[in-house]
Amino acid sequence: ELRHLGHLELQKEAWEIEDNESFIFPDDPCFTNPDSMVATIQQYCRDHGMPVPETHGQIIRCIFDSLARRYSEVLGYLREFSETDIKVLHIIGGGSKNDFLNQLTADACGITVLAGPQEGTALGNVMLQAKAAGEVDDIWQMRRIIADSIEIKKYEPTK
């Protein structure tokens, strides 16, 4: 088992891994509440004939690259059923703080990623209460208020 590190240190170590060849399928049931996520990731890679990540950086890079790849796959499915071209992906909640993953996502999806708000659920709740109280008229006004109140970070594909 690897020692505990802060998320910024983990991102830094993952950034230093240039050639990741280990990927997981994040939706696989084996990743739902395992006793050890690290051991489960390593076993998954072993079972699927991939190099087994050992270091913090290798494991985090495997996770981030796998998530970005999955986002791209799901975006492809959505494009099949959408009548409009999807040109921007919005990431909200805690994941919106992860600069490295957001950039990997922009690169994997080939589109702009807008990250934020971090507290999307709470802001949505406040806006619904404002609507119920008659303080806002519609969803467009709610979106304008939120957009004017928070910082949204923009990530463009680099590949």
Stretches found by the model and what they are:
Residues 1-88, 97-121, 127-158:
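Active-site core segments that coordinate phosphate-bearing ligands/cofactors
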Residues 94:
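Glycine-rich Rossmann-fold phosphate-binding loop(s) that bind the pyrophosphate
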